[in-house]
Amino acid sequence: MENHIVYQHKLAIYPEPAQESGILTKDTLFWQHNGVKQQLNLNDVVGTSLVEQEDGIPPGLLIYAYPKVKVGLITKKQQRVLQQYYFTVPDVKLRSQWQQAINNTLVNQPLDADIKPRRLQIIINPTSGKKKASQIFEQVRSLFEQSNLEYSVTETHSAADTKNLVHNLILSDIDGLVIVGGDGTIHDAIAGLMSRPDYETAIKLPLGIIPGGTGNGLCKTLLEQSQESYAPINAAFLIVKGKQQSFDLATVKQNNREYHSFLSLSWGLISDVDIGSEKLKFLGALRFDLYALLLLSALRTYKGKFSFIPDPDFKPTHHRTTIQQGEWQVIEDDFIFLWAMNTPWAAHDMNVTPHAQLNDGAMDVLVMRKGTSRLELLQALLRCGKGQHLDLPHLEYYKVRAFRLEPLTDKGILVVDGEPVDYSAIEMRVIPDLAYVNC
């Protein structure tokens, strides 16, 4: 056996008697069934529970696993699906030993360690997206129940409500924060963390994301990099497993106000679509496509000044791009749009900046200027769903550490993390590895 044995004792899958030994390694549980060796990958396991004798079934140990299973007749995407394993363990002490051995191994702790359950504060925004966040959480609640953790649930009903709740959390009472909502709710939660006197500690509280909004760009990014398909149950699975990574935030300065962004800034066509399509929110993500087609028929341009400090590793590929490292570069022109991203995915179906990473210390910026035809623009919008648009001739791509945008057109919309902000000069500067997420 390749892996070191962590624990070994009698164990049998029900209804067989516990005559053979089960073997636990750091990542696999082995047992015998009808003389054939069976195994369970602990990477799929979320928790265990002890079961007393009932209705003639002997006492034992129940293990909850969520392996990937292909679902759907057409897409056949892989989704986490519950599978339960009931093992016969008549001895009370042995049952508890098996449970502790498995639970401790799941969190990479010694068998004799006294492990306290992780404590999660779950925030649900029932007004996000199609207003189904509460129902979405109920679909995945059982996964939290089956895991070795404790949680409390609070519904919020406005941006201020979310900020105030997070601002007043007692950090010593929780180990993580879970958001069931859209990107706007995540923005509000981060604002609440950063408004605290102890923000330097608070912002390190790991964030778990369950998609309940329209776009869900951060959640899609986390699922994609973890090789999980886009589904609430898969997002909940990542949270329960508890793996963490750092991710960048950006400080935003505008009109003597300072706050933080985790996702994006858009201006021009993109922000017009994002905000103008709000009245079609009931259509979900389809609203963006329909409204974009409407605006393409009467395409606007926006005069402005885009200044930026390039990332040291950035190598320009566009013929219009000339870079002097370490200095502010300035582009003043008529723009169709500017789209700055901290994540690869702006929404679950829009891979806008496929080279972006959550903790690369930079933002990826896409620019299209006046002179781009409607056909070329439509092509860019259609291809960005799969991230196949960066080689288009009129699309400029930049990787930056900081940037300033000064709109020089009177009327327009600026959007940060999916929410409109003042239409005035704005500056964003990346702060590497400031926050943490479950991934």
Regions found by a protein language model. Name each.
Residues 329, 352-360:
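Active-site loop ensemble at the mouth of alpha/beta enzyme cores that anchors a bound cofactor
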Residues 156, 193-340:
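Catalytic core of DAGKc-family lipid kinases
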Residues 266, 270, 339-355, 420:
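Glycine-rich phosphate/pyrophosphate-binding beta-alpha loops
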